[in-house]
Amino acid sequence: MNIELRDPNIIMKLSRLGSFHQSRLSFLRSFLSEFKDWQYNRDLFDLDQEGYGTAVYSFKKKDRVYSLICYANKINDDERSDRVIATKWDAAFTLHDGVPLKEDIDRLRNEVPKQEVGRLSYKELTLSRANKSVRVFDHVVESLSNGNQPDLELLEKVGYLYRTTAVYGSGKFGLADRFRIKNREEINGPFRLEMMLVYLVRQFTFDQVNHVAKNKNPNSAVKLDPKICRNLGIGNSTGLGMAPFIVNHPTLLNNWILSREIALKKIREIKIVKTQDRDLFKDCLKSSLKNITSWNTESEYQLKKIKLLLKDIKKFISFLENKFDFQKDYPFNEIYLWLEKETCEECIEYVVSIMMEPFGDIVQPLVGQMSSEEEKYFNIPTERNVGDLKKILENKYSDILKINFNIEESNQKFWFISKNKEEPRLANRFEENGADLEQPLAIARDIKKLYERLLPLKDDLKINQFLIDNSDVRHVVRRAFIIEKFPYSEIQDNTIGENLVPIDMLRLKLSFFGALKFDPRSDKWLRICMFQGAPLPNELKDYDEQWVYKTYS
């Protein structure tokens, strides 16, 4: 049986992309798989009694070493903020290429806590900062110092001791440019160094809380139980800064989505499913119910999605247990077709992720195909003609061409860059000033504009001639020729319409990171948790690959 890849016109709608969940393809999971054979060390731990100071953690294999340098800082409660305008954080971090010398640690002590204002060197690969969940951190310290383990209900509700507010890489603020390291096999997957930083920061939070508790009451203090550590991750607060990325990197976006679609296609094409694969799928599905029921949010938008997801998952489990025969040919194709007919988008994509769990042999080769040499596809084939371009637009953007951009509802929003932090923002063009500073993120509108310009022209007119008088649409001409080869490179939705839900764009990217517990705080920012349930560094050599579905076992 040959299953077609899913239609980009359906999959690339924001409501569907905003229903994606982590999977075996997610970057934090592929990072753990890649680095499980590396030697982990805590090389320096120089904190005072209150937990302030410097620590260094490393992964080493043969002659290659990556070192996380941590600077824990004392700040006032009124200085602690997750917003981008913050200037102080509880801790700041950089991932250093190699073994840092004392001079490096001293140099970076003056720069890393400044974050965007500081300056790094080519020796540094990533940069981040994080704030404590003060309520949780203080509770854990108090409990441990008195010889007790902390309240599991509180820890389950929050899920972390610290949350990061930004992770930077690839040449920002003096960090090493990607060309310096891109040929290293171990970091071939997207965002692998960023995942390493977050993973090691997680371990630092456990070590710090143990250290503070021990110094508070040396005679009675106990360490945080490893099982509890495992069930804690790192939180993250993410705003609109992440949204333009998926618009500005079309071939990379395509490769992420395409890997997922190929995995699903191949799984649906399996004629006979082995008993152990069937059982693993069902076990992960049932175990994941705990993840859904422990998903805390105050967002009405997300609560509705969670409620419907839980209802549909239970309906699906009942179908599997009572009505479905896994012995029939192509069982996962039957399952997928049933899901499309009977359940919501959130449930469909949730189960698609779980379908991948038994099939590491299918998924693992795809992990290596998720990066992109984007500059290869930047040049516009100017020898092509207008007729070619029209056909591409009609075939690849059919739904977008139906949008009427002459009405306010379709044109309501505009994207701009804030002056104070150089971060993306979204505004109402009919109520706020600044539309003259609009960023080129309204791809649907510009595609429609391009199409209307092409309509009266002769098909044999060359693209180079067209661009002489139409340079303002050059960016979407390029995108059209990209989507011709990369079908999942474009969001098939209006990113400036009144119905835009920006967190759908954030959630798409975060699902590929491997995030859990999406908790929208508005339609423009949300909190998530990463590495919750993941093995600890000293457990990496032999860990359960399905850890993400067994967080609270």
Placement of each model-derived feature along the sequence:
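Amphipathic, interaction-prone secondary-structure segments
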Residues: S33-T87, E346, D388-L393, S398-I407, ...
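Intrinsically disordered, low-complexity regulatory segments enriched in Ser/Thr/Pro
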Residues: K62-L125, Q203-F245, N255-W256, D283, ...
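Long, solvent-exposed non-transmembrane regions
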Residues: N2-S19, E50-Y52, V65, A72, ...
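Acidic, proline/glycine-rich low-complexity IDRs
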Residues: Q149-M196, R202-Q203, D207-Y330, E334-K341, ...
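Long C-terminal interaction/binding lobes of large macromolecular proteins
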Residues: C347, S418, D446, R453, ...
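Amphipathic alpha-helical segments
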Residues: S15-R42
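Charged, structured surface patches that assemble and position nucleic-acid processing machinery
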Residues: R109-E153, K157-T165, G169, A176
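Alpha-helix boundary/capping motif
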Residues: Y336, K376, D399, N411-K413, ...
